A protein has these predicted regions:
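Hydrophobic alpha-helical transmembrane segments of integral membrane proteins
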Residues: 2, 105, 174-175
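Charged catalytic carboxylate motif
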Residues: 34, 93, 176
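N-terminal pre-catalytic segment of deacetylase/amide-hydrolase enzymes
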Residues: 1-22, 27-42, 57-60, 179-194
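Metal-dependent polysaccharide deacetylase catalytic core of the NodB/CE4 family, i.e.
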Residues: 18-19, 29, 40-168
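Catalytic grooves of carbohydrate-active enzymes
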Residues: 152-194
Length: 194
């Protein structure tokens, strides 16, 4: 996959023992506040790739995320699937979200978009960020124990770890997050934002 997207951030500095927790799809009142509470309790900052329409609908959560010092990324305005629309429509949706979120940090929904869409966003100054560790917290077939095995096996210096603040992930992420933070700290990792 990384060969298909060479101008995309998959992982940060491999020489530093830092990891980057990221959350996609929010903010939503059903779980974003609880995630923020957990992060605050552990003194961890994360990066939130937000859907623009959610950020507008739940502006108080966008404000809280900003106030608490987390990084903000763009996840399109309507959670658009890039492979199902043209370049102009996709870029327009990203730009609409950018006006709300005030960021040039971008992650495509589902981690997928077309090459022409990627090129157009890079030309407009966006930094496109994917991940090297996906927790699968949105998938009810996976247990929290399985997700922790993934974290233990694949996290390394500079890892970008993708989680979700969504209805699909709610129960699993709220159980996983404290365990994951405690484990990563025990391994000597620091947490940073993108």
């Amino acid at each position: 996959m990384q060969r298909l997207y060479p101008n995309v951030v998959w992982r940060k500095d491999k020489t530093q023992k830092k990891v980057y927790l990221t959350f996609d799809d929010g903010p939503i009142p059903e779980c974003t506040p609880q995630i923020l509470d957990i992060l605050k309790a552990y003194g961890v900052k994360a990066s939130f790739f937000m859907v623009g329409e959610n950020a507008v609908r739940y502006g108080q959560l966008l404000a809280r995320i900003r106030e608490e010092g987390h990084a903000i990324g763009n996840h399109t305005y309507h959670h658009l699937r890039g492979w199902k629309c043209g370049v102009d429509a996709y870029v327009e949706d990203v730009e609409k979200a950018s006006k709300v979120l005030e960021t040039k940090l971008f992650r495509p929904p589902h981690g997928r978009m077309g090459g022409r869409q990627k090129k157009a966003l890079l030309e407009r100054g966006y930094t496109i960020c994917l991940w090297d560790v996906l927790t699968h917290d949105y998938n009810s077939r996976y247990t929290v124990e399985h997700m922790m095995r993934v974290v233990r096996k694949y996290v390394r210096n500079g890892s970008i770890i993708t989680c979700h603040d969504s209805l699909k992930s709610k129960d699993r992420i709220l159980e996983l997050l404290p365990q994951m933070i405690a484990y990563l700290r025990s391994e000597g990792y620091e947490f940073a934002t993108l």
